[in-house]
Amino acid sequence: MFSDERTVGVAVLGLGNVGSEVVRIIEGSADDLAARIGAPLMLRGIGVRRVAVDRGVPVDLLTDNIEELVSRADVDIVVEVMGPVELSRKAILSALEHGKSVVTANKALLAASTGELAQAAESAHVDLYFEAAVAGAIPVIRPLTQSLAGDTVLRVAGIVNGTTNYILSAMDSTGADYDSALAGARALGYAEADPTADVEGHDAAAKAAILASIAFHTRVTADDVYREGITKITPADFVSARALGCTIKLLFICERITAADGQQRVSARVYPALVPMSHPLATVSGAFNAVVVEAEAAGRLMFYGQGAGGAPTASAVTGDLVMAARNRVLGSRGPKESKYAQLPMETIGFISTRYYVSMNVADKPGVLSGVAAEFAKREVSIAEVRQEGVVDDGGRRVGARIVVVTHGATDAALSETVDALADLDVVQGVTSVLRLEGISL
C-alpha cells in the first residue's frame, strides 16, 4: 500500500558519507528519479544520533527516535546506512514488521543475519535490497540473483577490499614495506585509524559470506569463511612474485566443490595470494575492486569499479531505492529469495592449491636437500626452487633465502611441511607462506 498515491515516502537512517550522498541524490535528482519510478520520492525523515549537530539539512527532517521514524505511516521505504550492527538489525526488523521495504549497505549485519532479515521481509511481503553491501558501486548482487538465476554458479572470486588492494598495489609499485604503505593509505583516507577489519580480512570475509550465500543458495556466515590478512607480506615477497610473473592480491574465493563421496560442498576463503600478471585480477590496482563470476553456461564474467566511498556506495543504494520504489508504485515485489539448501562447508585443510614458501636458512652445503626432503616426506611436489644470498647492512653474506613453489597440495599437507621446516636446525625461519591462484594445478 502507498502512504500517498502521489509519492513514495523515504526514511534514511544515518547521515555519514553514504547517507549524505543518498540524501543529496534524492534531492538533487528528484525529477529524474520520479520519471524512472513513476512517482516522486519524498524524504520524510533522517535518523541520526545527535539532532543538535549541524548537518546541512533542514533540522525538522532530523530525529534520534529511530523506532518512531521507521513506523511512520507516511514512510514506505527505509534506507539503512548507519553502521552499528545491533542498532541496524533492530531498526531493519522494526521497519520490515511495519511493512516498509528496506535498502541496506550493512555487510557485517547481512553476513551474520541475512536469513533472519530475508524471512522477516518475506513474512511482511516487502522488499529487502542490499546491492551496496558487497562492492560499492559494482553491480554484482543483482546479476547473481536475476541475470544468472537460470544458470549454475560454480565460482565467485575477486578483490572486494579497497584498503588492502591500495596497500598491496603501493608495495608492488614502490617497493614500500607494509607499514609505509598503510601510512600512505591512511593519509589518503583509504584506511581507518584502526585498520584491523580491513588488513586482517574481516571485511572481505563478510562480503564473501554474502556472495557465497547468494551464489550457491546456502547460508554462509562470516564465521564460516577461512581468513588470513596481509600484515606479514614483505617487499621481498613482491620481488619473488615478480620473478614468477605474478603480483600479490588479497582475494576472496567462494566455490562449489564436489567431495570424494559425491556430496556437494561450499568453500569460502580470504587470503593474500600470488596472481599471474596475465590474470584480469592482477591489473586491478589502487582502491578499485573486481569480482569474477564463473557459471556453467555463461562462463566467466568480470565486474570492475569503485568498491567503496560515499558516492559510489550511494549510487548502489539509490539504485536499490529506485527498484523498491518502482515495486511500491506497481503494487508488486522484487524477486523472491531462492529456497536455500544447507550445503556443508569444506574445511581449508582439504583445499588443494599451489604454494609459495619462503624461508631464511644457513648458508652451507646440504641445506637445500634437507629442505626438499621435508616436502617429499609429505608428498608435496616441488615445481620450482630459487635460492639467493642474504647480506647484512655492511654487505656481508650472513645466510641464504630459499623460495619453493609447489605443485597442487592440500592445506593440511603444506601446514605439516611448514611445521617440520621450522624445526630444522638449518632453517632460521619460514618467512612467508602464500598460495598461488589462477594457475593450473
Swiss-Prot record:
Entries under CDD domains matching the protein: ACT_HSDH-Hom
MF-aspect GO terms: homoserine dehydrogenase activity; metal ion binding; NAD+ binding; NADP binding
Active-site residues, record numbering mapped to chain: 207 (proton donor)
Annotated positions binding NADP(+): 17-18, 49-50, 107, 189, 192, 309
Official protein name in the record: Homoserine dehydrogenase
General function of this protein: Catalyzes the conversion of L-aspartate-beta-semialdehyde (L-Asa) to L-homoserine (L-Hse), the third step in the biosynthesis of threonine and methionine from aspartate.
Cofactor note: A sodium ion is seen in the structure; a metal ion may subtly affect the relative position of the nucleotide-binding region to influence enzyme activity, and could increase the stability of the enzyme.
Top-level EC class: oxidoreductase
Residue positions binding L-homoserine: 192, 203
Co-factor requirement: a metal cation
Associated pathway: Amino-acid biosynthesis; L-methionine biosynthesis via de novo pathway; L-homoserine from L-aspartate: step 3/3; Amino-acid biosynthesis; L-threonine biosynthesis; L-threonine from L-aspartate: step 3/5
Family: Belongs to the homoserine dehydrogenase family.
Binding annotation for Na(+): 131, 134, 136, 138
Transmembrane region(s): none
Alphabetical list of InterPro entries matching this protein: ACT-like_dom_sf (IPR045865), ACT_dom (IPR002912), Asp/hSer_DH_NAD-bd (IPR005106), HDH (IPR016204), HDH_cat (IPR001342), HDH_CS (IPR019811), NAD(P)-bd_dom_sf (IPR036291)
Stretches of the chain forming a coiled coil according to its record: none
Keyword tags: Amino-acid biosynthesis, Metal-binding, Methionine biosynthesis, NAD, NADP, Oxidoreductase, Sodium, Threonine biosynthesis
GO biological process, one term: methionine biosynthetic process
